[in-house]
Structures are given as structure tokens and as C-alpha cells.
Regions:
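Active-site beta3 strand of CheY-like receiver
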Residues: 51-57
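Acidic catalytic/metal-coordinating carboxylates
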Residues: 39-43, 66-69
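Two-component/phosphorelay signaling modules centered on CheY-like receiver
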Residues: 18-36, 101
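Short amphipathic alpha-helix used as the core "switch/output" element in two-component signaling
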Residues: 46, 68-80
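Alpha4 helix (beta4-alpha4-beta5 surface) of REC/receiver domains from two-component response regulators
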Residues: 69, 90-105
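C-terminal output helix
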Residues: 93, 111-121
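Receiver (REC) domain active-site loop signature in two-component systems and cognate sites
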Residues: 62
Length: 138
């Protein structure tokens, strides 16, 4: 868990299905991360522009914008943000497209708690160096 002198990392979870959002939140919050929920790609982009987000989890299939489209647009706003795509269609084409857009990883649905946590921790360590402590308060 994050210590009192550190703010927890914030994880943006984007999925049009509230059950899927809640399932991912139930995995990452007990590990000490703060979650921000979005139900669409447009909402996710607004959140990334307006709030401090340290990692993003996107569903592949959402109305109006796919997870890949969100990822592509996001790269113009925050090129370094680690992004993980969550999809029931984890085929070679989707995976190749995701990595071309610099996704950190692709997690197949239904999600596995251990896979999600392991992938989140690895992404945070790679970008920030500390998977639990978060950022030091100013």
C-alpha cells in the first residue's frame, strides 16, 4: 500500500460496460491504486487532459471509438502514459495494432486478477520505477 507521504497512482478504467469497469476497479483498488472510471473513449480523453492519470486500461470495443482509436488520440495528449488494452478479441491483428500504437500490453477477457495486477505493476515500474508508493507529495 502507498505510504502516507505518497499519493497513490491513479488508474483510468474505460469500458462502456459498468460491470467490466467495476470488476477492474475491484482488482486494482485493493492493491492501493486510485481509480478513475470512464464509460467512453471521449470521456477518457477528457479525463487524461484534465486530471493526473498514471496508467490507463481501455476496452477494445466501445461505441463511437474503439480502444485503439482512443489510444491513438491519447498519444497526442500524453505520449508516455502506459496504456493496457483489454479485449475479448485478443487476436494477432489487434495485438499488432495495439503495439504499433505503443500499448504496454493487451489483456484478454475475461480478465484474470493476477494477470491484471502483474501487468499493471510491470507497467508502473517501467515508467515510474515504483509500483506501489505513488508520487511524493509536494
Amino acid at each position: 500500500m502507498a505510504s502516507k507521504e505518497h499519493e497513490p497512482y491513479s488508474i483510468l478504467i474505460t469500458d462502456e460496460d459498468s460491470g467490466s469497469r467495476d470488476a477492474l476497479r475491484a482488482i486494482v483498488e485493493p492493491a492501493g491504486y486510485r481509480t478513475i472510471l470512464a464509460s467512453s473513449g471521449e470521456e477518457a480523453l477528457d479525463i487524461v487532459r484534465d486530471e493526473e492519470v498514471h496508467l490507463a486500461l481501455f476496452d477494445m470495443h466501445m461505441p463511437r471509438m474503439t480502444g485503439l482509436e482512443v489510444l491513438e488520440m491519447l498519444r497526442s495528449v500524453n505520449i508516455l502514459l502506459p496504456c493496457i488494452l483489454v479485449t475479448a478479441d485478443a487476436n494477432e491483428v489487434v495485438i499488432r495494432q495495439a503495439f504499433k500504437l505503443r500499448a504496454y500490453s493487451v489483456i484478454p477477457k475475461p480478465v484474470n486478477k493476477n494477470v491484471v495486477l502483474h501487468t499493471v505493476v510491470r507497467a508502473l515500474v517501467r515508467v515510474y520505477g515504483d509500483p506501489q508508493g505513488g508520487l511524493a507529495k509536494d
